[in-house]
Amino acid sequence: MGDPAPARSLDDIDLSALRDPAGIFELVEVVGNGTYGQVYKGRHVKTGQLAAIKVMDVTEDEEEEIKQEINMLKKYSHHRNIATYYGAFIKKSPPGNDDQLWLVMEFCGAGSVTDLVKNTKGNALKEDCIAYICREILRGLAHLHAHKVIHRDIKGQNVLLTENAEVKLVDFGVSAQLDRTVGRRNTFIGTPYWMAPEVIACDENPDATYDYRSDIWSLGITAIEMAEGAPPLCDMHPMRALFLIPRNPPPRLKSKKWSKKFIDFIDTCLIKTYLSRPPTEQLLKFPFIRDQPTERQVRIQLKDHIDRSRKKRGEKEETEYEYSGSEEEDDSHGEEGEPSSIMNVPGESTLRREFLRLQQENKSNSEALKQQQQLQQQQQRDPEAHIKHLLHQRQRRIEEQKEERRRVEEQQRREREQRKLQEKEQQRRLEDMQALRREEERRQAEREQEYKRKQLEEQRQSERLQRQLQQEHAYLKSLQQQQQQQQLQKQQQQQLLPGDRKPLYHYGRGMNPADKPAWAREVEERTRMNKQQNSPLAKSKPGSTGPEPPIPQASPGPPGPLSQTPPMQRPVEPQEGPHKSLVAHRVPLKPYAAPVPRSQSLQDQPTRNLAAFPASHDPDPAIPAPTATPSARGAVIRQNSDPTSEGPGPSPNPPAWVRPDNEAPPKVPQRTSSIATALNTSGAGGSRPAQAVRARPRSNSAWQIYLQRRAERGTPKPPGPPAQPPGPPNASSNPDLRRSDPGWERSDSVLPASHGHLPQAGSLERNRVGVSSKPDSSPVLSPGNKAKPDDHRSRPGRPADFVLLKERTLDEAPRPPKKAMDYSSSSEEVESSEDDEEEGEGGPAEGSRDTPGGRSDGDTDSVSTMVVHDVEEITGTQPPYGGGTMVVQRTPEEERNLLHADSNGYTNLPDVVQPSHSPTENSKGQSPPSKDGSGDYQSRGLVKAPGKSSFTMFVDLGIYQPGGSGDSIPITALVGGEGTRLDQLQYDVRKGSVVNVNPTNTRAHSETPEIRKYKKRFNSEILCAALWGVNLLVGTENGLMLLDRSGQGKVYGLIGRRRFQQMDVLEGLNLLITISGKRNKLRVYYLSWLRNKILHNDPEVEKKQGWTTVGDMEGCGHYRVVKYERIKFLVIALKSSVEVYAWAPKPYHKFMAFKSFADLPHRPLLVDLTVEEGQRLKVIYGSSAGFHAVDVDSGNSYDIYIPVHIQSQITPHAIIFLPNTDGMEMLLCYEDEGVYVNTYGRIIKDVVLQWGEMPTSVAYICSNQIMGWGEKAIEIRSVETGHLDGVFMHKRAQRLKFLCERNDKVFFASVRSGGSSQVYFMTLNRNCIMNW
């Protein structure tokens, strides 16, 4: 009945012997995709006849299949319902590339049945047309089946129509010839939706077989496709469809409008048992096929329909979005198509070409000889016919020449247009570059002008301050003379009345201020005026001040000599004692060009001022005693306030400035904002909890060295150490000790080490002089500002131990210079960046004090280093940690950046990024965080390190410790020991005064996390964001925007008036997945369309729709993209169900339904998917009751974890699958807790992760850690153990939301009242795993 077995005929085909198509056929355009290659519209070069050319690469794996297809076409294409095979050609490729096979077949110009259906109104053909097409398909199949050939891929795409409405079957790429004896196949090939159940069964059961009747099932599905526009289950993922087809009942027509004959025909074709399915001969006799109108009528009707649909298709193709995307995210985005198949490949073998040419010439010569003989015979028979034939050939040659000329002109026109476009694009780029250059020059000029203006202001301010200092000095001298006269009078009176000794001006508690002496009232008035001039912030926002203890209106005892010092000149007196203490010095490494004379500044002033007052316990009457601290009754000497201080004074009996021996220093109250930690250091014998205790006094030996150096310089000798070490002033009982008056420096204490195991930290001098009078964290007046001469200084007041710093800094690697003026932004931008009510108050007075001229110590424009050292180092005693010196360094460029407060106010930051301010910055009277907020972080082994933001950072020593040298301490503030108070660990870094706190080792950078933020303030709340390349797509309540992180921080609006709740970028697939809109639909946007909205370089793309929906789902609450091997799953949480979609690659290019789980017992709020041990799929979802799982295969739902100890509903935060557990173990985060369970609900660790507070967001980050964002802090924890690795305390309570993360960058947003938001990003340590 047929030919011999196919294996024998395959041997007859030698692919290498096929001719080259060059000069015979040429490709015109792509018209479709076949099983193994692309299909082109082609043209015969000589005759101009159109043909369909299938171009495929010849690989060793596919060579047999290609031979089989050629064999099928050659043998069975000579039928009216099968596309005619014209021939095959081989286009040779350069070595290393596969050769290309060109299969040339009959061209069907009307397209496929699928195209026809899509372009028909209602996506359905008329029943007569369907019957006609089905009959023609059956005739073609009958021809194949008669020769024991199964097509195996019958579908609308493989049924083509000619211009005359003839039906042709194409694509024999999967056809197979049946074995003569068995007659059945067991290979798994075909398109899923049209595939018969018995073909699918072959994949599951190796013993299963099928025969030619599988084509009948595919015909029935194609009939449904023509009636309904798509095959059944087309919304399902292909893999899911393969699973359902054998298990579901046979599909049926949805509409009732079809005739009984058509419905019966569908039912007959779609019988699941293929042995009961009728063959093609029987179906051709079926009433639906047999009883049709005349073929001529139907073909005319179908031809008209084809013409109409072609016009519609031409219009629709302009607006339909052509999707292009790579299958893998790692693939490069190359252009689709095979350009090499259209052009001749350069460098082809000349020998091969010559050989082929000779072959063709020989063949053409023989053909020409035959034609000539035929023509001579025909000419002899009919001369007129010969003349007609010649005329016809001539006419045809003329037409070919015209066509060739037209083609050349068209090509030249295209080239001209292309050149014009390129020239325009080049000109536009040039103009853009020139505009950018002009803008940069303009900005540079503005920056230079601003710099000059600031320099002039600094100079004027310096002169003003100098004049003011001179006036104050003169006024003080007069006051001192007046005071001396009054004291002489008092002494004379006391000599007359020796039994009656009263302190100077001991005010009663109810005494009227008007009764004070005239000099005191005058100084009080002068000080109040000075405060009003220099501290505008002190009165502008009274509402922001925190609670302060009440102050009595009057206090007994004299105001004392120090009280008379004006605010700009008031020194900070040291607190000496018989034991070892710490000294902090400001060490300028390079003098400023025009410094204010130090002799008239802070350091030398107290010696002259105090010299006029006697002290009875002083061994040398000419030298004043050191400042005493409050007495046992809690009295406070107001050292930095106005002379009419109304705090309690000392006892009348002892002199005003000497502390009695039997008095103990007052205890400092514990602040609620202080962070108690316990350090576990390798050098310590054990860890001791930090306590709020008094400062450690200085040793006698160090005191003697100090006096000896003063004596060598000829300075007046200060008094010896008192018997009892003076304690720190009570900052909470005296508000002036919490206030920094303008124009002088104050120091914040740093906690010393526990029992000498760590170098004791002294006091850090304030970074800047000119700051507004706002309360500081926990001021403790320290000996760091005592005036000490030095041989190495360039002006008075230089510390004596400057050599220590020199030795320290010689070992350090040089830092790269940073340009101070590279970063410019207006003061308005700086003020609006963090806190309007706090930053917008730094008026001209404060700004001018920030300038170099406003610094009373003249220590500007120099490498300013804050050194905290141990006094015992001078005597050669080495502390346990090597040198024991902690250095906080700034380069000259950084110092200049700090001084230019009208710039960003921050160092090392471009315009794009503006970091948040320091924890204590501009916090006028701000109350500290509540006890419950900070108490949670006080016992977790943390050390606070300053950060460049409104977040105060606490870091575990073991997590972010850089591996530096052994003689430097990893972070610059240490905790523990007696003699300190816990809340002294506060760096008072004011606006624009950011101190680089990197350890002084040779590492290029610090691995301590830092937080910065973008200046752009979004008007509506930021709900989500995703990184697209380096840039950030930001979704808000009102639209989608792109934040350009690579340029100047510009924000591009992409989509407006649409709410974006969640988003993810899949760059390899050219997709942005979102939950967006009022109805919370799952929409997919094409990245190329979004890109064009920014660049506007492709006008064709603008006409196309740039997004589509996934399914018809509304009310999506959450989704998750899960990548497993090469499959991308999309799990979606709806109101009462969970949908699972999967990405379908070519030719579908979309997410398609995979599984649906409806009627769940709990509403899913959070959803995820895991693949257990690489085999079992499970959906994990969180609800208000707990966490649950659904087995994907069986659909069974069960509870994983229900927190029974919580009676009310819970808020699930995150489902985190632990690494290296094969998807079996996870951390479930809810409320302020987290538990470790496996996918079967068994607790795997007796650890309950406990957050310090209720987080608003929880996220797993790349460093194998989890982060929790709360209103008071950001916590970083280990995902394996829940151990707290670090904390960032907020300056104020605020609502934060995690956005996205990549590598060592974590992005989150803050939401303020009124809905405005800003984007922050945190840079983690660089050792995090790069697994993006």
Swiss-Prot record:
<feature type="active site" description="Proton acceptor">
    <location>
        <position position="153"/>
    </location>
</feature>
<feature type="modified residue" description="Omega-N-methylarginine">
    <location>
        <position position="509"/>
    </location>
</feature>
<feature type="region of interest" description="Disordered">
    <location>
        <begin position="902"/>
        <end position="943"/>
    </location>
</feature>
<feature type="domain" description="CNH">
    <location>
        <begin position="1019"/>
        <end position="1306"/>
    </location>
</feature>
<comment type="subunit">
    <text>Interacts with TANC1. Interacts with RAP2A. Isoform 4 interacts with NCK1.</text>
</comment>
<comment type="similarity">
    <text>Belongs to the protein kinase superfamily. STE Ser/Thr protein kinase family. STE20 subfamily.</text>
</comment>
<feature type="modified residue" description="Omega-N-methylarginine">
    <location>
        <position position="501"/>
    </location>
</feature>
<dbReference type="GO" id="GO:0030425">
    <property type="term" value="C:dendrite"/>
</dbReference>
<dbReference type="GO" id="GO:2000311">
    <property type="term" value="P:regulation of AMPA receptor activity"/>
</dbReference>
<dbReference type="GO" id="GO:0046777">
    <property type="term" value="P:protein autophosphorylation"/>
</dbReference>
<feature type="modified residue" description="Phosphoserine">
    <location>
        <position position="701"/>
    </location>
</feature>
<keyword id="KW-0488">Methylation</keyword>
<dbReference type="Pfam" id="PF00780">
    <property type="entry name" value="CNH"/>
</dbReference>
<dbReference type="InterPro" id="IPR017441">
    <property type="entry name" value="Protein_kinase_ATP_BS"/>
</dbReference>
<dbReference type="GO" id="GO:0030424">
    <property type="term" value="C:axon"/>
</dbReference>
<feature type="modified residue" description="Phosphoserine">
    <location>
        <position position="778"/>
    </location>
</feature>
<dbReference type="GO" id="GO:0005737">
    <property type="term" value="C:cytoplasm"/>
</dbReference>
<keyword id="KW-0723">Serine/threonine-protein kinase</keyword>
<keyword id="KW-0333">Golgi apparatus</keyword>
<feature type="compositionally biased region" description="Basic and acidic residues">
    <location>
        <begin position="396"/>
        <end position="466"/>
    </location>
</feature>
<dbReference type="GO" id="GO:1900745">
    <property type="term" value="P:positive regulation of p38MAPK cascade"/>
</dbReference>
<dbReference type="Pfam" id="PF00069">
    <property type="entry name" value="Pkinase"/>
</dbReference>
<dbReference type="InterPro" id="IPR000719">
    <property type="entry name" value="Prot_kinase_dom"/>
</dbReference>
<dbReference type="GO" id="GO:0030334">
    <property type="term" value="P:regulation of cell migration"/>
</dbReference>
<keyword id="KW-0067">ATP-binding</keyword>
<dbReference type="GO" id="GO:0030036">
    <property type="term" value="P:actin cytoskeleton organization"/>
</dbReference>
<feature type="binding site">
    <location>
        <begin position="31"/>
        <end position="39"/>
    </location>
    <ligand>
        <name>ATP</name>
    </ligand>
</feature>
<feature type="compositionally biased region" description="Acidic residues">
    <location>
        <begin position="828"/>
        <end position="841"/>
    </location>
</feature>
<feature type="modified residue" description="Phosphoserine">
    <location>
        <position position="324"/>
    </location>
</feature>
<keyword id="KW-0547">Nucleotide-binding</keyword>
<feature type="region of interest" description="Disordered">
    <location>
        <begin position="363"/>
        <end position="383"/>
    </location>
</feature>
<feature type="region of interest" description="Mediates interaction with RAP2A">
    <location>
        <begin position="866"/>
        <end position="1332"/>
    </location>
</feature>
<feature type="compositionally biased region" description="Basic and acidic residues">
    <location>
        <begin position="518"/>
        <end position="528"/>
    </location>
</feature>
<keyword id="KW-0808">Transferase</keyword>
<protein>
    <recommendedName>
        <fullName>Misshapen-like kinase 1</fullName>
        <ecNumber>2.7.11.1</ecNumber>
    </recommendedName>
</protein>
<feature type="compositionally biased region" description="Polar residues">
    <location>
        <begin position="670"/>
        <end position="682"/>
    </location>
</feature>
<comment type="function">
    <text>Isoform 4 can activate the JNK pathway. Involved in the regulation of actin cytoskeleton reorganization, cell-matrix adhesion, cell-cell adhesion and cell migration.</text>
</comment>
<dbReference type="GO" id="GO:0005829">
    <property type="term" value="C:cytosol"/>
</dbReference>
<feature type="modified residue" description="Phosphoserine">
    <location>
        <position position="754"/>
    </location>
</feature>
<dbReference type="GO" id="GO:0007268">
    <property type="term" value="P:chemical synaptic transmission"/>
</dbReference>
<dbReference type="GO" id="GO:0007420">
    <property type="term" value="P:brain development"/>
</dbReference>
<dbReference type="GO" id="GO:0004672">
    <property type="term" value="F:protein kinase activity"/>
</dbReference>
